[in-house]
Amino acid sequence: MKKIFIVIIFLVGLIIIDGFFINPKGFKIAEKKIFVDNLPESFEDFKILQISDLLISNKKDINRLKNIKAKSNERKPDIIVFTGDLINSKNDLTDKDINDIIEILKSLDCNLYKYSVIGDNDQKNIDLFNKIMNNSNFKILDNESTYLFYKDITPIKITGINTVNVKPVETKEELTPVFNLVLMHYPDYIDDLSFENAIALSGHSLKGTIRIPFYGGIIKKDGAKKYIDDYYEVGTNKLYVSGGIGTENVKFRFNNKPEINIYRLEKK
């Protein structure tokens, strides 16, 4: 009985140390290849860097953002996409902190453009979100689409989905894209997409925050009840879910290292 008690105390201590002091700090770079049918040569090895769920609430989070910027710039991505939840709705940020965030995000380098969609936390202070992203040279895609050309006449169509309304504004298709790249905060919205053969990048789930070995994430929330892990094939669409960087109400992540994501396009 005493041995069992010691084991329990040890496991609880391990969970506390990992959940509060190890996993919420730092981050990893998760890299994946995305294979695309009939990918033009111009898009071979095209790099997409995804950042999600920063959920910045204090100066420590800002310092980590500086490290993210440094690692991101080392990788020299072609485009950068942010899939929502920039500032935690509960924060103690000052005006100076906000300006620091803008300067860091502005100095994120890529060959082409930076895109963003709006997360549920961003909706709670949309004016602040718009101020930061617009001043950081991110194009906010709020239920709208844009075409990305790169060394070729055939573009990628990039669409951003709002967390309030899953269906993007209908656009008259004047060009045939290589594929549709869909950016959305809520991964569960994949079930309602009108696209086919799309590649969707999302966040929000934090991969369940607490991940139990051989089981997976255990905390599911609105917008990420069905799809919380790395990758899913849903009909003809491919869904990639980032575990993101931050935490919400409690700075706790167990067995769940924060991450930024790099996707390389390759011809199938």
Listing of model-derived features with the role each one plays in the protein:
Residues 42-141:
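Membrane-embedded segments
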Residues 187-264:
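Conserved beta-sheet core of the metallophosphoesterase superfamily
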Residues 48-50, 81-83, 158-160, 181-185, ...:
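Structural motif
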Residues 131-138, 144-145, 150-184, 188-195, ...:
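Binuclear metal-dependent hydrolase catalytic cores centered on His/Asp/Glu-rich metal-binding motifs
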Residues 78-79, 115, 138-139, 156, ...:
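Short, Asp-centered acidic motifs that coordinate Mg2+ and/or phosphate
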